Amino acid sequence: MREQLIKALLAHAQGDIQKHVANVEVYFTNPAGIGEHSNIVEAIEQELDMIAKYQDQIDIIHKYFKK
C-alpha cells in the first residue's frame, strides 16, 4: 500500500509538472494568442511557481519516504 501511494503521489506531481511545462511552452511559442493574459511574464512566473511546487513534492518524497 505504501509503495502504491508513493507511486501515485509521484505520478500526480510529474503529470502536473508536464502540464505547467506545456503551458510555458505555449507562452513562449504563441504569446499573442493568449488573450486573458496581458502580462505574459507574470503568467510564466506563475507557471514556474507551480512547477517548483510539484518538483519540491517529488524531492521531498524521494528524500524522506522513498526507501
Enumerate the language-model features and the residues they cover.
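Extended, charge-rich alpha-helical interface modules
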Residues: M1-K67
